[in-house]
Amino acid sequence: EMLFGRLGEKKIYVDMIVQSTGKDNQASISFTVLKKDLPEVLAICEILRKEWKASEVTAKEDIAIVSAVGVGMMSSYGVAGRMFKVLSQHGVNIEMISTSEIGISCVIDAMYAELAVKAIHKEFLEN
């Protein structure tokens, strides 16, 4: 709440958010922001890291978000599996996943964006 409250006050748009707990019950949070906002986001995160005595703040810049979108998609069986399989078959590692009723979005390495879009398009629109 504190982190995203501060980002909201600065009018920084946060898209995908993933929280996980690793070894020793340490929480980790990952989220995507616009590249133009990254320096300000890192500054806010670093302030909070010190307050919370957290271990580190890292950022990855060269990412892309690819999505498969369609009404009622999540109620259709196998959509996520098909998308993940086709990305895997093309050597594309998925770093984050977000789902909604109308779509699935994946964060991937930016260098695979065009390949991923073509592969997803072929899987869902040409098959």
State where each predicted segment sits.
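A conserved regulatory-domain signal marking ACT and ACT-like small-molecule sensing domains
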Residues: 1-127
